[in-house]
Swiss-Prot record:
Region (Disordered): 25-130
Lineage top rank: taxon: Eukaryota
Organism per entry: Drosophila picticornis
Record note on modification: Phosphorylated with a circadian rhythmicity, probably by the double-time protein (dbt). Phosphorylation could be implicated in the stability of per monomer and in the formation of heterodimer per-tim.
Name the UniProt record assigns to this protein: Period circadian protein
Length: 143
């Protein structure tokens, strides 16, 4: 007789392939759609992400007025709380304007950001553009 130290296979182990095939053929519902956190309110989450992206996009719409050597007024159409740049300098060093340039300032002097006067103006990057903003959306912000 032949001896073995292995445990004999059970009925379920012997029929694993058939059981697996029968499971997938029955097309089970593993997670109901209304309880799936990813798809629970996808239209809202998608809209919120698009709104957030458009709010921090440097290519936002805007209106500007002002010319060479004058103070320029730029109003953005974004949802960021900082809604306008107003250059109050009388002695300009170039033309003022924003358009879709991301709110670049080309004149020196005090700058009002959202109505609060600042002596040195906003902190700008080396190329005189507004530095990128990093926003992390968490689930608590989307609810």
């Amino acid at each position: 007789s032949k001896s073995s130290t292995e445990t004999p296979l059970s009925y379920n182990q012997l029929n694993y392939k058939e059981n697996l095939q029968r499971f997938f053929n029955s097309k089970p519902v593993t997670a109901p759609t209304q309880l799936d956190p990813v798809n629970r309110d996808s239209s809202y989450a998608s809209t919120s992400r698009e709104d957030a992206c458009s709010a921090i996009s440097p290519d936002h719409g805007g209106e500007c007025s002002g010319g060479s050597g004058s103070s320029g007024n730029c109003t953005t159409n974004s949802n960021i709380r900082m809604s306008s740049f107003t250059n109050t300098s009388i002695t300009g060093t170039g033309t003022s304007g924003c358009g879709n340039s991301g709110g670049k300032l080309s004149e020196s002097g005090p700058v009002e950001v959202g109505g609060a006067a600042a002596d040195a103006g906003p902190s700008l990057a080396a190329d005189n553009s507004i530095p990128p903003i990093s926003v992390t959306l968490t689930e608590s912000l989307l609810n």
